[in-house]
Amino acid sequence: MSTGCCRAPSRGSAPGVSDPRADALQLIRSANVGPITYRQLIARFGTPAAAIEALPMLAARGGGRAPLLADPRLVAREFATVEKLGARHLFLGDSDYPELLAELDTAPPALIVRGKLSLTQRTCVAMVGARNASAAACRFARQLALGLGEEGVTVISGLARGIDTAAHLGSLARGTVGVIASGIDIAFPPENRELQGRVGDEGLLVAEQPPGTEPLARFFPSRNRIIAGLALGTVVVEAAPRSGSLITARLAAEAGRDVMAVPGSPLDPRAQGCNLLIREGATLVQSVADILEAVRPIDLRSVRSPVNGFGGGPAGDPGDAERATVTRLLGPVPVSVDELIRQSGLAPAVVQTVLLELELAGRLERHAGGRASLG
């Protein structure tokens, strides 16, 4: 679905919608504004409205044209469509935004949710695995999900074929969360349309993309980070070494969450990813008790305060020499932000501001693991 961008920074507001929320959605739906950039803009300018006004200036400093701003009329239409679907928008900084997800530097600034958001306030465990999973693996995944539900644990998965489907079916009665890579009104795969509807009715359905968005391949890694971010730990049940499930496990590890895996036969390619995770230190899972033992000790850990979606204050501007220093250190090969700070000798806030300007100018690409490169 097109976000309907326009160059003029029109400041209209959606009828019946408070200005800060309409501004927040317009900002995140605008070109070159991703989750990290959104956080930095709010931290720097305080409100989405102030950030929108500053976008042309920041893009010019980064050497690019003013970014395309989302059309306020389409923002208003999105609010209306979501309401008609029986869903609502949830913004970073809202009091009921999931705390574990808010810990991520890449936490989605806006989600669309339908169902029982309170499920995210319980102990949450993600369960992922192969789409072409064996019957035995699907049966075991369903048993694990059922057992976790009986222990009051919310099971999170991605509504894909195979292990995801088994995880949702096993936990539907006690509480499950489905995170999808499409708009909340699009069922993928099509055969899971009924299951997706039940998850929204009886559990919680979560989407980052606006309604009408088809599940393009590039949206699945983003979906996976939400699955991992909502949970204290991720369980992998059957996965090839180069599967999306291992991407979810890696994202969980990068977020400081527990990674668990069900071992399998070394003769089955579908088990090689799980066996690799165990060899690298993942918790071996043979029962519900193994999962509970892994996540319960960290269930009461302190959680970093979520970003206030509409608060903050301005930061200082970098000079031309500082911009040149950071830009010179960048190239086509991704480099970590920590390395840029170390090599430049500049304050972290200065480096982050230069990267923000470059991204808004369309000259910077963000990569997993806090890395960046020139686009």
Task: Tell me what each language-model feature is.
Residues M1-P15:
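Class I Rossmann-like S-adenosyl-L-methionine
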Residues G4-C5, R44, A54-L58, A294, ...:
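Short acidic/histidine-centered micro-motifs embedded in hydrophobic/aromatic stretches
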Residues C5, L41, V354:
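Residues in the recognition helix of alpha-helical DNA-binding motifs
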Residues R11-D96, A361-G375:
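Short, small/acidic-rich helices and loops at N termini and domain boundaries
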Residues G16-P20, F91-G375:
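Glycine-biased, small-residue-rich flexible motifs in mid-sequence functional cores and linkers
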